[in-house]
Amino acid sequence: MSSIVTGASGFIGRMLTRMLVDSGEKVVGIDRVPQPPRPGLTVLTADLLDDDGLVRAALADADAVYHLAGCPGVRDHGDGIAWRRHRDNVLAGARVLNAVPKHVPLLVASSSSVYGGARAGRPSHEADPVRPAGGYAESKVLLERLCAERLERGGRTTVLRPFTVAGEGQRPDMALSLWLAAAREGRPLRVLGSLDRTRDVTDVRQAAQAMIDLAASGAQGVVNVGTGRGQTLRALAAAVAEVLDTEVAFAVEPAPRIEPGASLADTRRLRSLIGWSPRTDLHDVVRRQAAAARPLLEVA
């Protein structure tokens, strides 16, 4: 079986690519960022919006496509961020949606941010109206609309809504990475809003496995990828302190509008499709992420 992973150099993309290759699949990894080659992996270094013949051929000939490429980052910052999000999340997504044959399973990474947070502590269900807050979530809603159009035309399409993925390989600008770096350097951990806010923290390994199982299940439409259990920021900070064997202090700031008070996945549809849902051992996830980041710190 041959699978395509776009965004193969990204956080979830690297883990997904590794797991697919380890399972014996032939994988084509597409990314603008070069990847180290390995047996079972064909690397295509390309921009999805370039008219690259190798990319077109790979997308047309795959048995399954995981479209994870995009412009990440929930918070609005930086010059030109709105255009980059539209370009990388919407326009590039449209290019992939049009290039993959209708009969090929296409799994597209959206985001739990489209929900705008859990409503009164109730888990977010796939049928809930979307309430995007901020440009990132809005770009993902536009991408989801394109996916719905492909599905209506008979194209096999699954929209993935991952919840707060953590573990080895997490981007350095994400919350847990920032907290680990701050704790190592003796700086206070920056907290937006309150330590009592909750997040559905999902282990990157289990998120990737859920995506693989969804591809095999023939699932179509929108599917949450989360645990269905909220973890407080206080519990996450305690895990950081325990893993690094240090005391931590906090710098609490008002939360911006786009920062939800809670995120929580309704996992009933996921479990009905693949028979299980992720379970996160918070200490283990933090330990693995901290261990993976240490060699990078030593090189720097």
Q: For each of these PLM feature ranges, what is it?
A:
Residues 3-22:
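N-terminal Rossmann NAD(P)H-binding glycine-rich loop of SDR-like oxidoreductase domains
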Residues 25-36:
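Conserved glycine-rich Rossmann-like NAD(P)H-binding loop of the short-chain dehydrogenase/reductase
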Residues 94-135:
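Conserved Rossmann-fold NAD(P)-dependent oxidoreductase catalytic core, especially the SDR/UDP-sugar
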Residues 183, 187-300:
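C-terminal substrate-binding subdomain of Rossmann-fold SDR/epimerase-dehydratase oxidoreductases
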Residues 48-88:
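NAD(P)H-binding glycine-rich loop region in Rossmannoid oxidoreductase-like domains
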Residues 145-199, 204-208, 239-240:
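NAD(P)-dependent short-chain dehydrogenase/reductase
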Residues 139:
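Active-site helix of classical SDR
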Residues 6, 30, 65-69, 106-112, ...:
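SDR active-site strand-loop-helix element
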